[in-house]
């Protein structure tokens, strides 16, 4: 499968997922984020093992030492990631808020309301904590 076809396939699936996610209430979103956090705790050894493979592959590909250092995970970093998710869980729901409202001379009331964007793409390198932070923030705001 070509890269373009692969990206198109991911894009279509992401758009479909965004439509489903945009309808979740804050309690369900927080419940899913709590389960994600528990998953990280329960599967820490598996995650660290997979990270060692990532680091080894990066070393084989002669990736810079500074980038490899950023790629490395340990138990302390897993705790930091989990703490970050806990903070995101405590954020208020950013969707459905009236940002401004006004009444037109003809009586029509117009409201500017926050809604999910839908699909968000993020480009970054070599930082596993960014993956979890971006995922949790996007999920909390109803985006994928």
Residue ranges, per PLM feature:
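N-terminal Rossmann-like NAD(P)+-binding subdomain of aldehyde/semialdehyde dehydrogenases
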Residues: 1-110, 137
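Substrate-binding/gating loop at the entrance of the active-site cleft, primarily
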Residues: 101-144
